[in-house]
């Protein structure tokens, strides 16, 4: 495996870009390696600048549910670009994507487009505070909702990877309005509401936590959050930036039949281009300017290229059998992977839901932040390096999720399993 060109580009990047990357986890610090610079992607594969091919289980951190360079998505982007890359004015494409979202998710009666998941969650919290007239929000240990100041309190994703649960630069005045509960622990939520019953504007939660590895909601947890928030007059916000359109044509809320007050989206709804969205009931969304008094704006919000890519992606998901294909591939891969893990004396575990999965270097059941943190990150780093040598690209952090796309096939599954088996045999004998 050659990496000379990637090493050269990383050195050059560090001269001009902090840390040489534009998002921390990409630096590969958590796996003790230099990052790979990717040249192109097609289907289930990516190719680095040194000519190495990898089966990709990062999929741009979730947006590429159809795989890389899907012909219909590429065509939609090209056709939109030929007419203009940005207008700073309303365009028909944004109505089309908004309608697709609203028709797919019953709780979303109106939706506002933004440019990232961070913008979506930040704007949703501002709206919740204005609507309720309250200041506090409740989030959960290890859950990541973007990098707005009020979310960088015991957060997940890159902050877990870096070992910094609360980012420097977040004023105490912001932090004191963010209350932190334990995922899958309703009692911890009840205690916070008991302490500040009239001050909590909203509870924001990943209905399937995907930023401390994959952690599934236990039976009754999401239902309990809905009951508690209603009882105290707070809003419930589902952060479906990862889970939206991942498991079905809609949100995870469609599957569990729970309607939050607000929903945030991103990733898949942009088809690989920068996008975010937040939506909910009309009486809440109509507080947003220019209809109401809660301000939010963006130069590139509703960008025609992102809207076209997102609409093309959602239409394919709605019309085809992608979800059945995703489940079949994931069941095949993870079913056989469980057999491999069982050979290692209870030192490994795995969580899966549909086309998301995480392999943890701990034998304990992973159900919350504290159990995630028992993972052996050193062994994961070694494992990751062995996978790359075998042509399999997993997230460069123990605390991120693997994504399966509709482009992955049985050939990919077979090679992945052989590579994982070999990598684990070597990793687990290392001290």
From Swiss-Prot:
Pathway where it operates: Porphyrin-containing compound metabolism; protoporphyrin-IX biosynthesis; 5-aminolevulinate from L-glutamyl-tRNA(Glu): step 2/2
Leader peptide range in chain numbering: none
Cofactor(s) demanded: pyridoxal 5'-phosphate
InterPro entries found in the cross-reference section: 4pyrrol_synth_GluAld_NH2Trfase (IPR004639), Aminotrans_3 (IPR005814), PyrdxlP-dep_Trfase (IPR015424), PyrdxlP-dep_Trfase_major (IPR015421), PyrdxlP-dep_Trfase_small (IPR015422)
An example Gene Ontology CC term for this record: cytoplasm
Subcellular compartments: Cytoplasm
Sites bearing N6-(pyridoxal phosphate)lysine, chain numbering: 267
Subunit structure: Homodimer.
PANTHER family reported in the protein's UniProt record: GLUTAMATE-1-SEMIALDEHYDE 2,1-AMINOMUTASE, GLUTAMATE-1-SEMIALDEHYDE 2,1-AMINOMUTASE 1, CHLOROPLASTIC-RELATED
Protein name (Swiss-Prot/TrEMBL): Glutamate-1-semialdehyde 2,1-aminomutase
Organism phylogeny: Bacteria, Bacillati, Bacillota, Clostridia, Eubacteriales
């Amino acid at each position: 495996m050659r990496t000379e060109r990637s090493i050269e580009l990383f050195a050059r990047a560090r001269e001009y870009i902090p840390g040489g990357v534009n998002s921390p986890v990409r630096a590969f610090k958590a796996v003790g390696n230099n990052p790979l610079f990717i040249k192109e992607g097609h289907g289930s594969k990516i190719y680095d600048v040194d000519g190495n091919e990898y089966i990709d289980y990062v999929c741009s951190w979730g947006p590429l549910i159809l795989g890389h360079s899907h012909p219909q998505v590429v065509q939609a982007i090209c056709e939109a670009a030929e007419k203009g890359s940005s207008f700073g004015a309303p365009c028909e494409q944004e109505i089309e994507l908004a309608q697709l979202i609203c028709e797919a998710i019953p709780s979303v009666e109106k939706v506002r487009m933004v440019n990232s998941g961070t913008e979506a969650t930040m704007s949703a919290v501002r709206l919740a505070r204005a609507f309720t007239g309250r200041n506090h929000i409740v989030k959960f240990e290890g859950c990541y909702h973007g990098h707005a100041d009020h979310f960088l309190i015991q957060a997940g994703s890159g902050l877990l990877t870096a070992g910094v649960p609360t980012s420097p630069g977040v004023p105490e005045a912001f932090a004191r309005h963010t209350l932190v509960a334990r995922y899958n622990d309703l009692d911890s939520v009840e205690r916070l509401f008991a302490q500040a019953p009239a001050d909590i504007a909203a509870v924001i939660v990943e209905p399937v936590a995907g930023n401390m590895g994959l952690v599934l909601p236990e039976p009754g947890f999401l239902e309990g959050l809905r009951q508690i928030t209603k009882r105290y007059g707070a809003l419930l916000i589902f952060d479906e930036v990862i889970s939206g359109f991942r498991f079905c044509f809609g949100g995870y809320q469609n599957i569990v039949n729970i309607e939050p007050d607000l929903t945030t989206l991103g990733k898949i709804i942009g088809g690989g281009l920068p996008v975010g969205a937040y939506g909910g009931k009309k009486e809440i969304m109509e507080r947003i300017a220019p209809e109401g008094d809660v301000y939010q704006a963006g130069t590139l919000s509703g960008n025609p290229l992102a809207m076209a890519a997102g609409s093309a992606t959602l239409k394919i998901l709605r019309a085809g059998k992608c979800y059945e294909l995703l489940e079949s591939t994931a069941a095949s891969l993870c079913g056989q992977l469980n057999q491999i893990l069982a050979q290692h004396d209870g030192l490994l575990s795995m969580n899966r839901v549909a086309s998301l999965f995480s392999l943890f270097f701990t034998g304990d059941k992973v159900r919350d932040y504290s159990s995630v943190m028992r993972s052996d990150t050193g062994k994961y780093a070694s494992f990751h390096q062995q996978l790359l040598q075998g042509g399999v690209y997993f997230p460069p952090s123990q605390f991120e999720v693997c994504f399966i796309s509709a482009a992955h096939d049985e050939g990919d599954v077979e090679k992945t399993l052989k590579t994982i088996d070999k990598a684990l045999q070597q990793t687990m004998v290392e001290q």
